[in-house]
């Protein structure tokens, strides 16, 4: 996917603004489902070159009758010219990503993509739906306040509105922390650990970075 960009640049991060995260959850699930049906090995089941045309003609004659079989030469000619005339050099849609197992898709997608979500968007809960998302993944939803737009009549109520998702049991307090803080740190401080230096959240960022490093060492 995307020309294998996250395989070639594993530390590169991408953030999508004002699109929510529901579509990201769908893309993530679809990537895995498509890989299962169209990976480099399975795709051969769909390769026109592997079609037994003689057997297909026999089956059409046997079950379709003479009327249908009389059109078989025409159909076969169209099939030959249409199905095998423009095959790509590489049949594996995921070749650029060098996917060997489903888990590779998770590792090349989840840490690399982040999704700006407005505080009044209930579908951002999908990002944290570990019982639904493949591999129990939680995607990188980010708080996008949308301040100054019509849907934010009072800028002091943005976080309060986001907290309603916790009150309504859509997300946990841990997920809320990731949504409003943790995922932003992952995005902007992953390549520049000092990104938040000199800001009011510097000490909290340092604390989270230390906890993350300790957790990774323990694995």
Predicted regions and their residues:
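Divalent metal-binding pocket/active-site signature
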Residues: 1-53
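Mid-to-C-terminal alpha-helical segments outside catalytic/metal-binding sites
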Residues: 3-4, 12, 22-23, 65-106, ...
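C-terminal structured domain segments across diverse proteins
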Residues: 30, 37, 41-42, 52-74, ...
